[in-house]
């Protein structure tokens, strides 16, 4: 996907999700994850959540347990994946200590938070577009 296509996808996501509830649906989360994995040069993510897996596959994202990008819901798993150099992505603020990227809801809108320290320890590089759209924390 070129930069123009990625920018169009971002506009579509933001326009689509502005009316969502505080807790993000699997479909909304999958749209953000698709942008994230595409920006990294990959098109796959590890994900054990059945509802999110179906939404990811509907977005054309391959769910593969060997991926360097991992969606985590449990801190113990996130800690292990982080130690392996994988990019941990999570949907709750309590995972901020382990996650390189958080996709959360704030005031009914999706919010992308990038933990730059955790991102540096991952063996994944995110594209400039994603880095610009996320709020960075050290």
Q: What do these predicted ranges mean?
A:
Residues 2-9, 15-138:
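Short hydrophobic alpha-helices and adjacent helix-cap/hinge residues
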């Amino acid at each position: 996907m070129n930069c123009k296509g990625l920018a169009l996808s971002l506009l579509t996501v933001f326009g689509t999700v502005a009316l969502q509830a505080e807790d993000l649906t699997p479909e909304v989360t999958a749209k953000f994850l698709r942008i994230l994995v595409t920006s990294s040069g990959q098109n796959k993510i590890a994900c054990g959540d059945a509802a999110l897996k179906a939404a990811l596959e509907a977005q054309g994202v391959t769910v593969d347990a060997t991926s360097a990008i991992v969606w985590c819901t449990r801190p113990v798993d996130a800690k292990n994946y982080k130690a392996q150099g994988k990019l941990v992505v999570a949907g709750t603020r309590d995972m901020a200590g382990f996650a390189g990227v958080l996709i959360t809801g704030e005031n009914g809108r999706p919010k992308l938070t990038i933990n730059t320290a955790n991102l540096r320890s991952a063996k994944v590089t995110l594209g400039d577009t994603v880095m610009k759209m996320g709020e960075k924390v050290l």
